[in-house]
């Protein structure tokens, strides 16, 4: 990639709710980098630049449907970080422009059917050119993907065993922003529920096992001895599990995972009778909600009760949030390896900002140390694209990331 491009990183969707947080993060953590804010509104971008005048970001205007403007944007930077969702509506042309110009790309999407389209359209071209297109670099799906990979890596290094299974248990405290809500509802509007339900939606062709149905998402409450708690299905599980399974398939040559590797994730609900009741209630509520949102009139009604795009929790609420992802991996001969990724701050906003910004900074600053070398490209997952480089950057940003023995 040409080093003469004017910018190292462009933040697309910078005036949105999460976008503004990425601007603040870059203003505080990207000294020495050449970066710019981008979006469709000149006035909003100028106001944003004035707010962060000391950081002196550049300003680029490009509508999400203007291929020529997006080509011009992609040609001016080495990395694009996009927070402009729903990505099925506002992301496709930008990804295409990045692939055409060999510009690395990260985003915060959880829209797996859209990611499948990007894989089908662009994986081969991006792989050929060494361009890293990395969707899902927010809370969806960095903790799951990086955590499962670190557990599998530790099993191999410490026990000389391939990883046969990993399960993850999430504890979260935080709110929903309008962009996330719009992305979730947009995915249902597109009539792609059968794709959402496919456990191996994101896998390369020919890598799904014959018993794919046995990997379907958990539906009920369960008592788990490893986590010593009652668990319910995790609302983001149908996103994160697909990403982890794609990682295992893409890394098959590394022999970290068994051919029949299994991954599932859950939400922690507590212990005893209260935990059992809560887990059962959540499981029933999720099933009922999913059925209800399958009807367009109910989706439109639900949209009136969630934040609008550009809105989200208060600064105080985001600061008081937190997340914890505990993982238990089992090796092919039965060895057990635990791991944990945790952090302070609302997971969908504060943590997502750290995840995606550090992913972009890894591309901009650590390209020579990334796994696979300069020639690795394609529509990748966070662990395949960044590996230990991202883990180290997240530790440096204050997150807890630690595989540990039982």
Residue ranges of each PLM-predicted region?
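N-terminal Rossmann NAD(P)H-binding glycine-rich loop of SDR-like oxidoreductase domains
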Residues: 7-28
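Structural motif
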Residues: 8, 78-79, 104
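C-terminal catalytic/substrate-binding lobe primarily of soluble NAD(P)-dependent oxidoreductases
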Residues: 19, 153-406
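A short, Lys/Arg-enriched amphipathic alpha-helix followed by its capping loop at the start of a domain
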Residues: 25-32, 251
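Conserved glycine-rich Rossmann-like NAD(P)H-binding loop of the short-chain dehydrogenase/reductase
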Residues: 31-44
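Short, conserved SAM-binding/catalytic segment
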Residues: 48-55
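Conserved Rossmann-fold cofactor-binding substructure of NAD(P)-dependent oxidoreductases
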Residues: 60-79, 83-89
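Glycine-/Pro-rich loop/turn segments that contact NAD(P) or position catalytic residues
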Residues: 86-206, 246
């Amino acid at each position: 990639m040409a080093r003469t491009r004017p910018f190292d990183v462009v933040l697309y969707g910078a005036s949105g709710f999460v976008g503004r947080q990425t601007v603040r993060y870059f203003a505080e953590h990207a000294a020495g980098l050449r970066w710019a804010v981008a979006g469709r509104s000149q006035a909003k971008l100028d106001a944003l630049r004035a707010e962060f005048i000391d950081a002196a970001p550049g300003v680029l205007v490009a509508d999400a449907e203007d291929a020529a403007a997006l080509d011009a944007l992609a040609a001016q930077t080495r990395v694009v970080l996009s927070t402009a969702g729903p990505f099925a509506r506002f992301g496709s042309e930008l990804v295409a422009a990045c692939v055409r110009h060999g510009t690395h790309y990260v985003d915060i999407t959880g829209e797996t059917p859209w990611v499948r389209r990007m894989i089908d359209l662009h994986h081969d071209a991006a792989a050929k050119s060494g361009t890293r297109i990395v969707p899902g670099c927010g809370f969806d799906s960095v903790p799951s993907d990086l955590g499962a990979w670190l557990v599998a890596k530790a099993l191999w290094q410490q026990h000389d065993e391939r990883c046969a299974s990993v399960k993850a248990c999430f504890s979260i405290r935080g709110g929903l922003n309008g962009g996330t809500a719009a992305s979730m509802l947009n995915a249902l509007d597109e009539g792609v529920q059968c794709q959402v339900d496919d456990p191996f939606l994101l896998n390369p062709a020919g890598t799904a096992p014959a018993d794919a149905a046995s990997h379907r998402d958990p539906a009920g409450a369960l008592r788990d001895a490893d986590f010593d708690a009652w668990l319910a299905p995790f609302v983001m599980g149908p996103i994160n599990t697909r990403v982890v399974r794609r990682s295992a398939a893409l890394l098959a040559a590394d022999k970290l995972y068994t051919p029949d590797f299994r991954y599932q994730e859950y939400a922690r609900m507590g212990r005893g009778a209260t935990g059992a009741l809560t887990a059962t209630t959540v499981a029933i509520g999720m099933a009922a909600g999913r059925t209800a949102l399958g009807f367009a009139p109910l989706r439109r009604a639900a949209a009136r009760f969630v934040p609008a795009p550009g809105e989200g929790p208060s600064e105080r609420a985001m600061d008081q949030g937190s997340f914890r992802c505990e993982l238990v991996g089992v090796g092919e001969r039965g060895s057990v390896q635990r791991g944990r990724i945790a952090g302070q701050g609302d997971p969908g906003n504060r943590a997502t900002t750290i995840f995606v910004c550090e992913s972009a900074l890894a591309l901009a600053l650590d390209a020579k140390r990334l796994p696979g070398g300069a020639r690795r490209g394609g529509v990748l997952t966070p662990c395949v694209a960044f590996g230990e480089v991202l883990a180290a950057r997240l530790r440096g940003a204050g997150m807890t990331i630690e595989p540990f023995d039982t």
